[in-house]
Amino acid sequence: MTNIRKTHPLLKIVNNAFIDLPAPSNISSWWNFGSLLGICLVLQILTGLFLAMHYTADTTTAFSSVTHICRDVNYGWIIRYMHANGASMFFICLFMHVGRGLYYGSYAYMETWNIGVILLFATMATAFMGYVLPWGQMSFWGATVITNLLSAIPYIGTNLVEWIWGGFSVDKATLTRFFAFHFIFPFIIAALAMVHLLFLHETGSNNPTGISSDADKIPFHPYYTIKDILGALLLILVLMTLVLFSPDLLGDPDNYPPANPLNTPPHIKPEWYFLFAYAILRSIPNKLGGVLALVLSILILVLMPLLHTSKQRSMMFRPISQCLFWILVADLLTLTWIGGQPVEHPYIIIGQLASIMYFLLILVLMPMASTIENNLLKW
């Protein structure tokens, strides 16, 4: 009799995705981040569910309810900090995952890549709305500043902002709807992740060489299941070290005072994982221009397959492109640092130069380097 995992309507889906899936024999640890993102998502949904049991989405009690979770609920503090730092781990894995895709040319699988970009946008939207929920100073002012950016849209901007706010300022209606959206979005992300996986399994995984691995495949289980478990253990180790030893390391102290509409914090800044985009936004003196640059800084990923001019898929054998890739990483780290600094000399000019460099690298320098490398192959 055939094994039940190969015949059962539900089990065979799991079997074909996680057990008997033919995988390249040479994929490195950079291919671990997909499964780690899945673990992060499950962890966020579970901790979020337990937080939602004790949280109240009302301007008068939201802050107190979070305090109540940390002080009075059994292990509430650990659930709250696992959720907050889980978001940071989520974004670390996301950035690594996207970086891997850029380096090894995984964007050639266009459907998988484009759904990945949509997933990135959805995750950023979810994290932003989640940051508003504790209703601290930075929650309130962050929500005010970021939603206000939509007013830069010509003609409909102001109406759009007031429609999102549910009034003439960020208030009870805004908090309630953000909670509703923050609750539903992770499930939309989970559904999109399934589609992401569906498209990936149509083509199979890429590998570090960028060459077809059809001639040399191994079963996903046990080889990559055990590898993913090791990755998961390391992820949990890092997360729990953060949670148990320095839970507020990545947070902003300005979010500890409760929201006060009459008092603006001296430096409004988002969580660390948005700082690079925030720096690009701030480096353009024009409001609409800044908003466009902000959106394009992520949306530019969609253009990656079109900007690929190399005859080789991966950067593994392309030293000039490798060099530019790591300059891009350094540039993004610079932008992240600038995003957390006040708007004054010399930070303004550094931010503007780093922003120009970001778009220049992706749109001009990297395609040029690929063309040069193609010509070098002829020698």
Curated annotation (Swiss-Prot):
Cofactor note: Binds 2 heme b groups non-covalently.
Binding residues annotated for heme b b562, in chain numbering: H83, H182
Entry GO terms, CC: mitochondrial inner membrane; respiratory chain complex III
UniProt xrefs under PROSITE patterns: CYTB_CTER, CYTB_NTER
Cofactor: heme b
Keyword Transferase attached: no
Tagged with keyword Metal-binding: yes
Membrane topology type: Multi-pass membrane protein
Origin: domain of life: Eukaryota
SUPFAM superfamilies according to UniProt: a domain/subunit of cytochrome bc1 complex (Ubiquinol-cytochrome c reductase), Transmembrane di-heme cytochromes
Record: residues binding heme b b566: H97, H196
Residue stretches spanning the membrane: 33-53, 77-98, 113-133, 178-198, 226-246, 288-308, 320-340, 347-367
Any single biological process term in GO: mitochondrial electron transport, ubiquinol to cytochrome c
Location(s), subcellular: Mitochondrion inner membrane
Keyword set, alphabetical order: Electron transport, Heme, Iron, Membrane, Metal-binding, Mitochondrion, Mitochondrion inner membrane, Respiratory chain, Transmembrane, Transmembrane helix, Transport, Ubiquinone
GO MF assignments: metal ion binding; ubiquinol-cytochrome-c reductase activity
Binding site for a ubiquinone: H201
Gene3D superfamilies membership: Cytochrome Bc1 Complex, Chain C (1.20.810.10)
Record-stated family: Belongs to the cytochrome b family.
Subunit structure: The cytochrome bc1 complex contains 11 subunits: 3 respiratory subunits (MT-CYB, CYC1 and UQCRFS1), 2 core proteins (UQCRC1 and UQCRC2) and 6 low-molecular weight proteins (UQCRH/QCR6, UQCRB/QCR7, UQCRQ/QCR8, UQCR10/QCR9, UQCR11/QCR10 and a cleavage product of UQCRFS1). This cytochrome bc1 complex then forms a dimer.
Note, other: Heme 1 (or BL or b562) is low-potential and absorbs at about 562 nm, and heme 2 (or BH or b566) is high-potential and absorbs at about 566 nm.
Free-text function comment from the UniProt entry: Component of the ubiquinol-cytochrome c reductase complex (complex III or cytochrome b-c1 complex) that is part of the mitochondrial respiratory chain. The b-c1 complex mediates electron transfer from ubiquinol to cytochrome c. Contributes to the generation of a proton gradient across the mitochondrial membrane that is then used for ATP synthesis.
Name of the protein in its database record: Cytochrome b
